[in-house]
Amino acid sequence: MRYLSVAEIAKKWDVSERSVRNYCAQGRVNGAFLTGKIWNIPENAEKPERINKRKEEPLTLLDILKEQKASKYSGGIYHKTQIDLTYNSNHIEGSRLTHDQTRYIFETNTIGVEKEVLNVDDVIETANHFRCIDMIIDHAKAALTEKFIKELHLVLKNGTSDSRKDWFAVGDYKKLPNEAGGMDTALPEEVADKMKALLTEYNAKEEKTFEDILDFHVKFERIHPFQNGNGRVGRLIMFKECLKYNIVPFIIEDNLKMFYYRGLKEWDNEKGYLTDTCLTAQDKYKAYLDYFRIGY
């Protein structure tokens, strides 16, 4: 085996000779030995890592969303998520704004239309939904609570025509019975207890799986705790929980709408309907991550 001097190794490793001698004296260079006062170092010896050098963990999607949100970075995954999630989640619920109009509101905080009538609530709820997405990014790691869920609803419906109705509780549970997709939901007097039980059951699980998140969503939608806005709040919760547990999130688009509704309805009999629908949506979001070179 060929041995090199301290000076030769220092040049090879691009460090000072003093650092090389310290590494050798600390026993951190395999095969190095002294001949008198001269260190003999194997030519294939590897440079020791600095003790205080912290191994960098790869950034998660949540880390990147937080960074891009804070820096107001345009054209990245945060920008795309805000527009696509808002447009699709509102569109499922009947919003008539186009994808381009949604993007324009996000990018400019204005909307320009010619020879077209827009529903004011569609515009307000779009702007509000952007704020809701910021909330789930900021609080992604926090435990899911009734308080947070109610805050999402409050922000989503703030300033809408619903908020001016006496019988509509903004940021609180429903006052009147309602149905979802032709199915009965929890009665107003049952909602608080059912929500507490659902959250207790869900939060008792230390690590949530993809199926756990979908199961919570189904049960949440069946309770239908709010007078209106349950679907959007429910999908925001799913996105938040995926971020928390480093699961690739997903956006239910219009072409998946009927499969999504079927999955909610048939969950007890066949979990595969909803699971496959959400996995299809997840594949599309993975394509976004691939494009932006974000690992998952």
Which ranges hold each PLM region?
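FIC/Doc superfamily catalytic core
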Residues: 2-13, 17-29, 34-296
